Amino acid sequence: MNLGFRVTGKFVRELLDVLDEIAEEIRQEEKEKYPYTEWERKREVVKERLRKLPEYVREAISVITVQKRVGRPKKVDLEKRVMLFLFARLMDKSNRDIEELLELFEPLFGIKVSYKTIERLYSDEEVRMALHNLFILLLREEGVSGDFSGDGTGYSLTITKHYRSNPKRKGKDFRYVFRIIDIDTGMYVGFGYSDRSEKDAFEKALGMLKSMGVKVNSISLDKYYSSRKTLRLFDAETAVYVIPKRNLARIGFDWLRVIERIVEAPYRFLKRYFKRNLSEAGFSADKRRFGWLIRQRREDRREMALFAVGLWHNVFAVRVVR
């Protein structure tokens, strides 16, 4: 599309006023009755994933070749270590609590382990590889559309601070994650972790997509990522749905593509842009189910803990399109 006229800062501000009016219409539409019958039907898919989880784990570890090491072999085989790790992360309890729970579930797991053994799972390289393979298996099973939304959030390292209630949301008491969600399936397709910033986590999540060979057809991002630098991370074939800032002065070719898309179909642009709410809803559900606190002290173990949250999210993912 060629606009046929020069795009100025004034034009952008007027265009944003129009988008504000359309946004209110869309918010009213979103209040329509939720299709609970369809949601209940899709919950059966989740139950099937849970039933097949041991099978998925076996497939995930089948492609891992472990070289024999000097010293004592591990007392627990890889399949049981992966299942134990997933169980520990799902429970969202301290390692000592998990140790006590395993006394109850010993007939199920067939093992007795100490809280120290559980903690070491968070830095077990073989478990990490198995989880990565499991992540990919779940995506292959469900399919990847190429149409995504992305957002970041923070997790607290101390029980006295919460990311949502801390106005600065920075510093040594928080760690940042960025997850990219498939708007068709509700599954996470990319994950990034950082002890520095949300944008650093964002770039790592994009790197994960690239490493898996996942093509990004479209993506919606919030205003925090409304910059030319962000737009240049995507190629010309990717439709980026982000709202320009009101003080945008230098338009340039990168922003022109976004503005052309808005002018061509403002309602459709906003409907797609608001799909980013899926990311916020996903974070909220994850923190309710798996907690908002990171108990691990080592950086690699913190990253592993938060990757596992995304993995469990995909197991429980239910996407009902209205």
UniProtKB/Swiss-Prot annotation:
Intrachain disulfide bonds: none
Record has Protease as a keyword: no
GO terms assigned for molecular function: DNA binding
Gene Ontology BP terms: DNA recombination; transposition
Keywords: DNA recombination, DNA-binding, Transposable element, Transposition
Known function: Involved in the transposition of the insertion sequence ISA1214.
Family stated for the protein in its record: Belongs to the transposase 11 family.
Protein name: Probable transposase for insertion sequence element ISA1214
Organism: Archaeoglobus fulgidus (strain ATCC 49558 / DSM 4304 / JCM 9628 / NBRC 100126 / VC-16)
